C-alpha cells in the first residue's frame, strides 16, 4: 500500500505522458499491482483515450482503483427524509420498550418534532427522557403514562403542556429547562406529588398563588426568567430545601419566605432586590445565601440567627456596613464575599468574626487600611482578596498570616511590602500589580511555596537576589 501511495505522488509531480508503458509496467510489477489482465486493461484504456481525444486521469497511475476526483458522492437526502428516518427510529424504540416492558425510555437528542400517539401504550414507564429535541407540544396521550415518576423535557421549544398531564399522580420530577414557556403551565400546579421542578431559562413572568399546591417540593428552580414578584403562598412550601430564583427581576421578597424553614440553599443573585424581610432570620437551616448583583443597601440583623450559614455572597450591592456582631454570630461561615460594595472599613465585630472564614473577598471597595489584629483569630484564612481598594500600607502583624495561600493586593497604593512577609510560609499566589512599589524585601526569598508572583505596573528598579530561592515560581 505504501508503495502505491508513493507512485501516486510521483504521478502528480511528473507528466504521465513522459513515462513509457514499459516503465509504468515495471513500476506496477514492483508494487504487485500488475499481471497480464492489468496490462490488457491499460491497452484498452489507452485506446479509449485516443478515441476520446483525452486522457483519463485515473489511468495515470496504474494500480490505483479510484482517484480522489472519481470518488462516488452520495446525493443529499430529499427534504423530509431525515425526519421520516427519525420518526421510524422513534417508533422502533417505542416497540422495543413495549416488548421488553422497560420502565425507562430515553429518546433524548433524536431531533423529534412530534411524539407518536402510540406512546400511550407504555403505561409501565416510570422514567421518560425527551430532552434535546424539537418538540413544540406533547400529545395528550402522554397523560396515559400513569406510573411516570420522572419526565425530562428540557431543551425543546415547548410553549405549553397538555391538561392530561394532570393524570400523572406519581410524578416526582419534571424538567422544563430551556423551553419557550411564558407562564408556568396551569397543569403543573396540579402535580401535587412533585418534589423537583426545573423551569430555568424560559420566559415566565409570574408565579401563581396555586404554587401552594406543590407542598411536597424540595427543589424549585425558576432562575433566568422574567419574574417580578413571588406570591405570599411561596411560604406554604414548607418542605423546600433549595429555592433558586436567580436572574429574575425581583425587587422584594414576601415575608412569608420565613415559613420555609427547611431551606438550606437560597439563590437570589442577579435580581433587583432593594431589601430583605426580617423573617429571613427564621431560616435556621440555611447554609448558602446568594445575594450578589442586587441593589441592597442593608442586611437585616436577624440574619445572625442563621447560624448554619457557611456561604454568604453580597457582591455588587451598595452596602457600606454590616450589623455589628453579625459575622461573629455566623459561627459556621467559611466563605464571605463583600466585593464591589461601598465599604470604607472592615466590618465592626473584632477578630472573632473571621475565626472560621476560609476565603474573604473585599475587592473593589474603598478600604484604606487593614486593622491591626483583625486576623489574629483567623487560623484557617487562606484566601484574601483586597484588590482595587485604597491601601497605603499593611498592618504590623502582617507576618503572622501563616495560613495564607492566596493574597491579592493589586491596584492599591502600596509603596512597601514589610520585611516580615517572610512569615507567610504557606503563600502560593501573591498579586502586587498596580501599586507604587520600588523594591521587594529580601524576606520574600523565604516563600518557598510561591508559584505565582505578579509585579506588573509598579516602579521596581531591581529584584532581590533571594528571588532565586523560589524554585516553584512560574514565570509566564
Where are these regions (language model features)?
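The feature captures the LRR N-terminal capping module
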Residues: 1-431, 436-442, 449-452, 462-465, ...
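Short, glycine/acidic-rich beta->alpha junctions
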Residues: 459
Amino acid at each position: 500500500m505504501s508503495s502505491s501511495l508513493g507512485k501516486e505522488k510521483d504521478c502528480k509531480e511528473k507528466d504521465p505522458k513522459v513515462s513509457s508503458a514499459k516503465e509504468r509496467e515495471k513500476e506496477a510489477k514492483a508494487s504487485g499491482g500488475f499481471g497480464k489482465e492489468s496490462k490488457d486493461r491499460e491497452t484498452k484504456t489507452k485506446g479509449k483515450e485516443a478515441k476520446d481525444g483525452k486522457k483519463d486521469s485515473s489511468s495515470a497511475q496504474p494500480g490505483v482503483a479510484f482517484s480522489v476526483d472519481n470518488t462516488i458522492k452520495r446525493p443529499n437526502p430529499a427534504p423530509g427524509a431525515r425526519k421520516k428516518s427519525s420518526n421510524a427510529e422513534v417508533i422502533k424504540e417505542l416497540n422495543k420498550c413495549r416488548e421488553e416492558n422497560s420502565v425507562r425510555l430515553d429518546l433524548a437528542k433524536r431531533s423529534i418534532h412530534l411524539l407518536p400517539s402510540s406512546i400511550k401504550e407504555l403505561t409501565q414507564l416510570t422514567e421518560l427522557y425527551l430532552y434535546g429535541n424539537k418538540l413544540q407540544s406533547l400529545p395528550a396521550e402522554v397523560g396515559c403514562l400513569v406510573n411516570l415518576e420522572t419526565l425530562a423535557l428540557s431543551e425543546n421549544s415547548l410553549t405549553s403542556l397538555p391538561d392530561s398531564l394532570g393524570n400523572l399522580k406519581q410524578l416526582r420530577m419534571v424538567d422544563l429547562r430551556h423551553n419557550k414557556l411564558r407562564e408556568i403551565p396551569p397543569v403543573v400546579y396540579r402535580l401535587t406529588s412533585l418534589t423537583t421542578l426545573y423551569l430555568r431559562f424560559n420566559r415566565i413572568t409570574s408565579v401563581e398563588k396555586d404554587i401552594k399546591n406543590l407542598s411536597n417540593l424540595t427543589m424549585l428552580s425558576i432562575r433566568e426568567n422574567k419574574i417580578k414578584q413571588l406570591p405570599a403562598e411561596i411560604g406554604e412550601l414548607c418542605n423546600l430545601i433549595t429555592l433558586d430564583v436567580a436572574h429574575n427581576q425581583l425587587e422584594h421578597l414576601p415575608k412569608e419566605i420565613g415559613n420555609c424553614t427547611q431551606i438550606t440553599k437560597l439563590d437570589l443573585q442577579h435580581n433587583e432586590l432593594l431589601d430583605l424581610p426580617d423573617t429571613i432570620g427564621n431560616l435556621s437551616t440555611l447554609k448558602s445565601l446568594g445575594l450578589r448583583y442586587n441593589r441592597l443597601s442593608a442586611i437585616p440583623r436577624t440574619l445572625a440567627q442563621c447560624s448554619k450559614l457557611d456561604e454568604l455572597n453580597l457582591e455588587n450591592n451598595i452596602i457600606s456596613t454590616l450589623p455589628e456582631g453579625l459575622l461573629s454570630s455566623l459561627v459556621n461561615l467559611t466563605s464571605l464575599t463583600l466585593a464591589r460594595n461601598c465599604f470604607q472599613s472592615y466590618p465592626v465585630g473584632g477578630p472573632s468574626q473571621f475565626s472560621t472564614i476560609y476565603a474573604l473577598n473585599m475587592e473593589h471597595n474603598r478600604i484604606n487600611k487593614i486593622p491591626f489584629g483583625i486576623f489574629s483569630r483567623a487560623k484557617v484564612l487562606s484566601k484574601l482578596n483586597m484588590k482595587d481598594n485604597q491601601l497605603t500600607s499593611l498592618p504590623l502583624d502582617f507576618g503572622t498570616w501563616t495560613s495564607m495561600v492566596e493574597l491579592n493586593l493589586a491596584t492599591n497604593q502600596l509603596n512597601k511590602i514589610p520585611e516580615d512577609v517572610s512569615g507567610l510560609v504557606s503563600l502560593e499566589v501573591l498579586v502586587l500589580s498596580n501599586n507604587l512599589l520600588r523594591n521587594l524585601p529580601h524576606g520574600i526569598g523565604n516563600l518557598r511555596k510561591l508559584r505565582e508572583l505578579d509585579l506588573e505596573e509598579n516602579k521596581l528598579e531591581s529584584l532581590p537576589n533571594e528571588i532565586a530561592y523560589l524554585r516553584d515560581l512560574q514565570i509566564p
